[in-house]
């Protein structure tokens, strides 16, 4: 019982940290939007806000009932909405030339995402996994293409690579988080899931300065 309580406390602390970081991102993004009135910062603020709401529900449920939410779709609505805003941010930041740019490297996204999706579906809800992996494939496809395009640019245009790297890190850690959750269920300091969850928090916050650099292009 004590071990279970300790694991629950660790998960609560990790989720509180994630909620705090995304709330901070929401306020900082909002301040930047109010100062500049740039659509990119509005979309970034929405990304953080939706992610925060999903994390907040999950954390409050843990605190009140000492177990993970049984109806996880409530949190997923917020998290899914955040990825949609992330994609819209991707599209807004990209130029017409970047969107028309073609590279075979982009195929890495479905080549990795589809097998992982099949694997995840054997452990959890099929519809949820199809939706999540589909979105991850889309945003990673565009970021791989954008990164390849940024590598051949000069001047301020090459700063877009920081944003694309940030998105790819976010996607990679999400994949690793889900994979560790399938292979090593539970939440403890020795579980890779715990460390990937903390790493995800760092990736989320890193998107703020990465977007700032991209907006300057």
What is the meaning of each model-derived region?
Residues 64-70, 119-130, 184-187:
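Membrane-interface helix caps and helix-loop-helix hairpins in membrane proteins
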Residues 17-29, 41-64, 75-85, 161-183, ...:
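Hydrophobic alpha-helical transmembrane segments of multi-pass membrane proteins
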Residues 36-49, 98-109, 154-167, 216-217:
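Membrane-interfacial loop-to-transmembrane alpha-helix junctions, especially the N-terminal start
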Residues 4-24, 124-133:
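Hydrophobic transmembrane alpha-helical segments in integral membrane proteins
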Residues 25-36, 59-108, 144-150, 208-215:
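Internal transmembrane alpha-helix with an interfacial aromatic "cap," most often the third helix
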Residues 141-217:
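C-terminal transmembrane-bundle signature of multipass membrane proteins
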Residues 1-4, 217:
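Cytosolic, intrinsically disordered low-complexity tails and loops
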Residues 106-145:
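Hydrophobic, aromatic-enriched interface-forming segments
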């Amino acid at each position: 019982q004590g071990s279970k309580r300790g694991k629950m406390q660790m998960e609560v602390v990790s989720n509180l940290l994630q909620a705090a970081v995304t709330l901070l991102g929401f306020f900082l993004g909002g301040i930047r939007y109010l100062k500049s009135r740039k659509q990119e910062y509005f979309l970034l603020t929405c990304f953080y806000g939706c992610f925060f709401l999903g994390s907040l529900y999950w954390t409050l449920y843990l605190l009140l009932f000492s177990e993970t939410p049984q109806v996880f779709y409530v949190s997923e609505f917020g998290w899914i909405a955040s990825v949609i805003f992330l994609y819209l941010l991707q599209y807004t930041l990209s130029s017409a030339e970047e969107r028309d740019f073609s590279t075979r490297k982009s195929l890495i996204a479905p080549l990795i995402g589809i097998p992982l999706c099949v694997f995840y579906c054997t452990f959890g809800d099929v519809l949820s996994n199809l939706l999540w992996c589909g979105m991850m494939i889309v945003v990673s496809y565009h970021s791989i293409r954008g990164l390849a395009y940024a590598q051949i640019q000069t001047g301020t245009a090459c700063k877009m690579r920081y944003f694309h790297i940030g998105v790819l890190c976010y996607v990679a850690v999400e994949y690793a988080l889900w994979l560790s959750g399938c292979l090593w269920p539970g939440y403890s300091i020795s579980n890779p899931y715990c460390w990937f969850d903390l790493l995800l928090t760092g990736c989320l916050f890193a998107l703020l300065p990465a977007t700032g650099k991209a907006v300057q292009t």
